[in-house]
C-alpha cells in the first residue's frame, strides 16, 4: 500500500463561502489518493502577542500548532487584500512559527494558490506568502504557479467547479502530490 500524506490546508479567507474555500474544497476532491487534504481553521486564532505566549498560550494557538505539526505538508489558499496577505493568514503564519525555535512549519513541503475576482489572481498575496515560507524553512513548489483570477466564474450555480478550470487544478494538485512525496523523503 502506498503512503498517504496528510496535508493541512490553510485558507486565508474567513468567509464560509469564499472563493478560496471553494477552491480548497475542489482541490481536496481532485487530490490523488496519496494526499489527504484537510482544512485547518484559522478564524478563532487570537492575534499573536509574545506577552500572551509567555503567560499562557491560548488553546486555539495550541490546537492550530498541533494540527500543523501532525501534517506532512501544507497548502495555502489565499485571497489578496491590498496587494498582500490577509491579516488572518499572516496571524496564522505567525502563530504557527512561535515560540521561536519551535516552528510548526519547519521543513514541511508547501504550495500557494491565490484566488481573486480580479484579473491578476492574487499575485501580490501569493508572493507575500512565499516570502514568509522561505524564512520558515518550508520547501515551496515553484511550478506550476497558481494565480487564479476571475473567481466568480470558476463555479456553476450549484457550486460545482467548471470544466474549464478543472484541468488546471487537477494538474496543480497532481504536481503537488509529487512535490510532497519528493520533499517528505528528505
Swiss-Prot record:
Signal peptide span: none
GO MF annotation: an example: NADPH dehydrogenase (quinone) activity
Activity at various pH: Optimum pH is 5 for chromate reductase activity.
Temperature dependence comment: Optimum temperature is 80 degrees Celsius for chromate reductase activity.
UniProt cofactor(s): FMN
Amino acids binding FMN: 13-20, 80-83, 116
Reaction catalysed by this enzyme: a quinone + NADH + H(+) = a quinol + NAD(+); a quinone + NADPH + H(+) = a quinol + NADP(+); Cr(6+) + 2 NADH + O2 = Cr(3+) + superoxide + 2 NAD(+) + 2 H(+); Cr(6+) + 2 NADPH + O2 = Cr(3+) + superoxide + 2 NADP(+) + 2 H(+)
Listed EC numbers: 1.6.5.2, 1.6.-.-
Keywords from the named record: Flavoprotein, FMN, NAD, NADP, Oxidoreductase
Top-rank taxon, per record: Bacteria
One Pfam family this sequence matches: FMN_red
Cofactor mode of binding and number, as noted: Binds 1 FMN per subunit.
GO cellular component, one term: cytosol
Record text on activity regulation: Non-competitively inhibited by sulfate.
PANTHER family the record matches: CHROMATE REDUCTASE, NAD(P)H-DEPENDENT FMN REDUCTASE LOT6
Family: Belongs to the SsuE family.
Subunit structure of this chain's protein: Homotetramer. Dimer of dimers. The tetrameric configuration has a central role in chromate reductase activity.
Task performed by this protein: Catalyzes the reduction of quinones. Acts by simultaneous two-electron transfer, avoiding formation of highly reactive semiquinone intermediates and producing quinols that promote tolerance of H(2)O(2). Quinone reduction is probably the primary biological role of ChrR. Can also reduce toxic chromate to insoluble and less toxic Cr(3+). Catalyzes the transfer of three electrons to Cr(6+) producing Cr(3+) and one electron to molecular oxygen. This reaction produces transiently a minimal amount of the toxic Cr(5+) species and reactive oxygen species (ROS).
UniProt-recorded name of the protein: Quinone reductase
Organism annotation: Pseudomonas putida (Arthrobacter siderocapsulatus)
Gene that specifies this protein: chrR
